[in-house]
Amino acid sequence: MSRSLKKGPYINLKLEKKVLAMNESGKKAVIKTWARASMISPDFVGHTIAVHNGNKFIPVFVTENMVGHKLGEFSPTRTFRGHAGNKKK
């Protein structure tokens, strides 16, 4: 189920506060976050956000196409090692 429209999108307040402070000062630094469920707002465009994937932080450069998606979508948690192949002797 999707989130109720009357509630609005979930955006981590701490993350949003950091991005807005960087927009005012004009700085461009990497912001670390564990908030994978946070929605990407238009204020985040142009920033690099390091999203935790359970093991390490994956840097995600936010573009206009990403607005409306969640941060966790761009930080995969599992590594694909390939399907079992034919064992050649």
From Swiss-Prot:
Molecular function as annotated in GO: rRNA binding; structural constituent of ribosome
Keyword terms: Ribonucleoprotein, Ribosomal protein, RNA-binding, rRNA-binding
Function: Protein S19 forms a complex with S13 that binds strongly to the 16S ribosomal RNA.
UniProt record similarity statement: Belongs to the universal ribosomal protein uS19 family.
Gene3D superfamilies for this protein: 30s Ribosomal Protein S19, Chain A
SUPFAM superfamilies in the record: Ribosomal protein S19
InterPro entries from the UniProt entry: Ribosomal_uS19 (IPR002222), Ribosomal_uS19_bac-type (IPR005732), Ribosomal_uS19_CS (IPR020934), Ribosomal_uS19_SF (IPR023575)
Pfam family name, one: Ribosomal_S19
Cellular component GO terms held in the UniProt record: cytoplasm; small ribosomal subunit
The organism of origin for this protein: Porphyromonas gingivalis (strain ATCC BAA-308 / W83)
UniProt-listed GO biological process terms: ribosomal small subunit assembly; translation
Name of the protein in its database record: Small ribosomal subunit protein uS19
